[in-house]
Amino acid sequence: MATRPQPLGMEPEGSADLLHGPEGARGQYGSTQKIEDLMDMVKKLQKVGSLEPRIEVLINRINEVQQAKKKASEELGEAQTVWDNLQKELDLLREEKVRLKDILNRKEETLRIMQLHCQEKESEAQRKHSMLQECKERISFLNSQIDKEKAKLRKLRLDFEEHLETLMSQHKDTLEFHKPEHLTKEMCVLDSSKEQLLKEEKLMKVKLEDVRQRLCALGGPEGSSSLIEGLFLRSHEAAAAMQMFKDENKKAEEFLEAAAQQHEQLQQRCHQLQQKRQRLKEELEKHGVQILAHSTQNEEDSSWRMASPKPVEVHEETAQDQERPSSRT
């Protein structure tokens, strides 16, 4: 029994079960095209008037169309299943995308925080490096200043030691000169020189008196005495005696003058040496106080400055030398 073709404009049976999708849309479009072709063929046959002989052909064509429709429905179901699976996978991928995007945002935030932290660390390291460089420069400057101060102190110490050695040598010379033995010897020499000069003076006086007596003895009476005196004065003996007397007198005067000058020079030298001894004693006392203060300051500043023991030793020697003259005097 042949089925009647459906009216135009009506959808075939089961078309309401078609789902939207790429494969279902292609199957639905193919089935609709075939049905429209059949309807066009029926209209053409109706117009021609030869519809009955073509019924079986139409039935066969309708069966083919139904089989194609069934096959398309199956393919559509499979496509719908694939579509659903793909849709689920798409949802999962979207969820994964959202999750990964959230992770990416957190990672980017962490990266930004780490970059800021790294920048802070770099700035801190640069600041510490600059501070370290400044500290090194300051330390080098202070070391140079310390070296300069040490050089100055060394130079001052050497100058002081040299000056102190000079004072000590002068003090020793003065001490040697002012020793009781030396002074006694000098006084003995002066006394002996004085006694020798006095003896020579007395001898010259005796010689002068002898010459006068001889002259008086040679005079005689008044008339003959003048003649004899004139003859004697004109004689070679009188000239030799006068010349000898003048020479002896001149030598005695020169010797007395030299002895007086030497005595005066010795007195002046003794006075100068006494003044010099007093001045050296005062300087030694003053330098002794300075050396003691300097040694105390060196002990206080020994954390960054080395103190030399030489000034202390020199101070001790100076104190001993000061004690010696005081004990001898």
Curated annotation (Swiss-Prot):
Coiled-coil region list: 54-167, 194-294
InterPro entries per record: SYCE1
UniProt entry tagged with the keyword Cell division: yes
GO cellular component terms, A-Z: central element; chromosome; nucleoplasm; synaptonemal complex
Tissue specificity: Meiotic cells (at protein level). Expressed in the ovary and testis.
Origin superkingdom: Eukaryota
Subunit-level organization: Homodimer. Found in a complex with SYCP1 and SYCE2. Interacts with SYCP1, SYCE2 and SYCE3. Interacts with SIX6OS1.
Region annotation (Disordered) ranges: 1-29, 291-329
Any GO BP annotation: cell division
Functional summary from the UniProt entry: Major component of the transverse central element of synaptonemal complexes (SCS), formed between homologous chromosomes during meiotic prophase. Requires SYCP1 in order to be incorporated into the central element. May have a role in the synaptonemal complex assembly, stabilization and recombination.
Biased composition (Basic and acidic residues): 312-329
Name assigned to this protein: Synaptonemal complex central element protein 1
Compartments, as annotated in UniProt: Nucleus; Chromosome
Pfam families assigned to the protein according to its UniProt record, in alphabetical order: SYCE1
Family designation: Belongs to the SYCE family.
Keywords: Cell cycle, Cell division, Chromosome, Coiled coil, Meiosis, Nucleus
